[in-house]
């Protein structure tokens, strides 16, 4: 608790400095950070290797080790991502609305930082930089608590970040890492209302549920991704195959990867064998309902939990449905309100799908893998929010702000 109090106090103080920082000053600091990450590549890789070795000794699946791994190319991508945030418009100080009321008061609504943001996350070291940069750009101080499996990588990254920001004239406490990775400290952080204005969990279902059940700090939920691809009877065959393979296999360990294929009965016998062949190239394990299993050559029988699970692996659940309505009902029952896709050339069916499916992102004839800040064109995101307050979908710069009313008068009093 001592570490939390010390760093919470420092973050609160730093947030006041950051709220007054100019866009020019913040951007200059971020450009320096982008360069410093490249300069320290060798050290970052050396520290990351400690985490990788520990994960292998534990028998961690390769798909999860991939989330943990830093490479020279990935550090270049992280550095480039920092530059992309520099290029984005700073929302702080933006006047979103202005009007005069009956009392001749001029009322303006402007964007301001949230204050101090707490982020609890799991394996991916790139989150340490992404989260730090987004919070910093929007004038927020941030306290990060990563998983124990990435502690050496995170400490090394935090050292680079803090040294770089300090050299640019910002407090080291603008961005901080909780180095105690115990559950007790995480629980204490969830109740740090004295210093934290909001808490954002990024990780698996268990982590997110733990935060939701225990936090007294306001939480923005970044939900798990049990994403579906529905192949309609009016779907183009090759398009459906290409989208399915991309959504499932391009990076199965991320939250916007597809976990379940729903396919209309009218095209199942024709499309499923070709899909199985394409997926076999990636050694995808298929878990199918009775009708799909009767068509596929190699598939295990799906269980109830297979419709609910976020596999984060080369595993795909498959179900044959009688109609688009059945697919929609299945998605709304088992989905996590993240990203859902329909493949169909029927306009009315596509419209019905996007209107009825409850998700942060709904795709028509495209892969779910585009639910990402960079892919959508607004830079790195702090996470994918699956709730409806305070933000929904990929959370970029604007979603890390609040609003303040500024009222100008010339002596008005209220009768």
UniProtKB/Swiss-Prot annotation:
GO terms for biological process: L-proline biosynthetic process. InterPro entries: Ald_DH/histidinol_DH, Ald_DH_C, Ald_DH_N, Aldehyde_DH_dom, G-glutamylP_reductase_CS, Glu-5-SA_DH, GPR_dom. It is found in: Cytoplasm. The keyword Oxidoreductase applies. Its main location: cytoplasm. Keywords: Amino-acid biosynthesis, Cytoplasm, NADP, Oxidoreductase, Proline biosynthesis. It is an enzyme of class 1 (oxidoreductase). Its EC number is 1.2.1.41. Belongs to the gamma-glutamyl phosphate reductase family. PANTHER family: DELTA-1-PYRROLINE-5-CARBOXYLATE SYNTHASE, GLUTAMATE SEMIALDEHYDE DEHYDROGENASE. This is Gamma-glutamyl phosphate reductase. It comes from Listeria monocytogenes serotype 4b (strain CLIP80459). The gene is proA.
């Amino acid at each position: 608790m001592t570490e939390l109090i010390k760093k919470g106090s420092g973050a609160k103080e730093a947030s006041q400095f950051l709220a007054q920082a100019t866009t020019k000053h913040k951007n200059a600091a971020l450009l320096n950070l982008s360069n410093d990450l490249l300069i320290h590549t060798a050290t970052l890789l050396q520290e990351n290797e400690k985490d990788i070795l520990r994960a292998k000794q534990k028998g961690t699946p390769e798909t999860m080790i991939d989330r943990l791994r830093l490479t020279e190319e990935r550090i270049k991508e992280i550095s480039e991502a920092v530059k992309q945030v520099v290029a984005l418009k700073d929302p702080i100080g933006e006047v979103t609305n202005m009007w005069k009321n009956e009392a001749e008061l001029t009322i303006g609504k402007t964007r301001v930082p949230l204050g101090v943001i707490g982020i609890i996350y799991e394996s991916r070291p790139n989150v340490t930089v992404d989260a730090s940069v987004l919070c910093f750009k929007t004038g927020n101080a941030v306290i990060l608590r990563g998983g124990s499996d990435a502690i050496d990588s995170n400490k090394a990254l935090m050292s680079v970040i803090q040294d770089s920001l300090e050299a640019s004239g910002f407090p080291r406490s603008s961005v901080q890492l909780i180095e105690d990775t115990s559950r007790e400290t995480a629980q204490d952080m969830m109740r740090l209302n004295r210093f934290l204005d909001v808490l954002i969990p990024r990780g698996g279902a268990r982590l997110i549920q733990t935060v939701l059940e225990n936090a007294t700090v306001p939480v923005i939920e970044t939900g798990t991704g049990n994403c579906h691809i529905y192949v309609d009877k009016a779907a183009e065959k090759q398009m459906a195959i290409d989208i399915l393979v991309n959504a499932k296999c391009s990076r199965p360990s991320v939250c916007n990867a597809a976990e379940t294929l729903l396919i209309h009965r009218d095209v199942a016998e024709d499309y499923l064998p070709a899909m199985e062949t394409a997926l076999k190239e990636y050694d995808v394990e298929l878990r199918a309902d009775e009708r799909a299993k009767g068509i596929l050559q190699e598939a295990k029988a799906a269980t109830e939990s297979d419709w609910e699970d976020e596999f984060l692996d080369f595993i795909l659940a498959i179900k044959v449905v009688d109609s688009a309505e059945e697919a929609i009902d299945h998605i709304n029952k088992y989905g996590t309100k993240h990203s859902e896709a329909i493949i169909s050339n029927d306009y009315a069916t596509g419209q019905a799908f996007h209107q009825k499916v409850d998700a942060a992102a709904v795709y028509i004839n495209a892969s779910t893998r585009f639910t990402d800040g960079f892919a959508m064109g607004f830079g790195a995101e702090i996470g994918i929010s699956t709730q409806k307050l305070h933000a929904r979908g990929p959370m970029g710069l604007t979603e890390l702000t609040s609003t303040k009313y500024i009222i100008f008068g010339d002596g008005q009093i209220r009768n």
